Amino acid sequence: MNHLRAHILLAAALCINTLHAQSSDSAIVSILQQKDVVFTHNNKVVLLPSGKEKFEDMFKAIAQAKSSVHLEYFNFRNDSIASALFDLLKQKASEGVEVRALFDGFGNDSNNKPLRKEHIDSLRAHGIEIYEFDPIRFPWVNHVFLRDHRKIVVIDGNVAYTGGMNVADYYLHGTEQVGEWRDMHCRIEGGAVSPLQMIFLKLWNRVTEQDIWGPKYFRAYKPTEIHGLRPDTTSTAGHKKVGIINREPRISNDIIRVFYTEAINAAQDSIKLINPYLTLNRKLKKALRNAAKRGVKVEIMVSAKSDIPLTPDCVFYNVHKLMKKGVHVWLYQPGFHHTKVIMVDGKFCTVGSANLNARSLSWDYEENAVIIDKPTTRQLDQMFDNDKQKSVYLTPETWDAFRTPWQKFRGWFAHLLTPFL
């Protein structure tokens, strides 16, 4: 019996040593591959860290489309940038390009400049196929769950855009409420475009009851015929390893949670995290505490301002608790940081649509690009470090100056509602 116990303990020790010997990027790839995530190795990735850069680059790409333009957004806010986009899409449709667009019913209804029936009818009259995903009809309020929160654009099957931005003027000009609106998007060329196209077409066919498929939509390995875009100037351009994690309710429920939790658990040196709605769950809180405890430098950036009520109270409550466990917390001051990124050990990162709240972790349709690439991660690390210059470092003293006793109580109360935020 003692022999058996000794063998079991030895085997466990070997497993632990092997896990710690494995680099964090290798570990996360292995874990995601077990969840059927496919990584391709021939990608270019260009970060687009502002609305101006995203829309300028994307409009240039759409203007050169030859075959198809597919768009999937939580919402198209009916303002000037959406009007400019739709004018461009009308032009492409008149040239014979297939233009398809999806938007979420709740995302549309919950913004203050929604697309109305007359707008949709006009777009269809100009050759744009546009459909609303799961419209909300009274009294079926249960439909506020399982929303499509993705942000995907695929052009000619070989250029894709994804990240945290919808289509709205405030990505360019900010808002009176919060000021500057910061966010992150990226452009991908290479094999990782095909999974994004598959995600779009699967939902498109479900919503429209069409059967759109075939090789013309999957041209990720063919040379890009779109020119004049912002180049990938890194040493790894065309050789980046990228996987797409797709949260689809009832099919891949836990993929976002698994990625973030295991990325944090795998970290050996550093974690830098920006997320606007950091309500977290128990596993993520525990992972962050444990990372700090084992000597990983954990840095989190959240906005001092927010676009919605209650959720930020929970966020501030969480980061204060984490601060007391050794996590470095920064409160971004100039505006609202809507960015959703994590960078680990300077080796890998993610850019995508997923927040770290109950909706993204447990309910909504989401997708993120996981980028296993040091130069791209370094670019995001540099952005984080630059933004620290515009932020307040959280300490017991700055916490007391930042939050009144009433606000602290409100945060405690809000954290009780975490499963619903």
Which residues are covered by each model-predicted region?
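N-terminal secretory signal peptides that target proteins for export/translocation
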Residues: 1-3
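Charged, low-complexity intrinsically disordered terminal segments
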Residues: 6, 19-421
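Bacterial N-terminal signal peptides
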Residues: 7-17
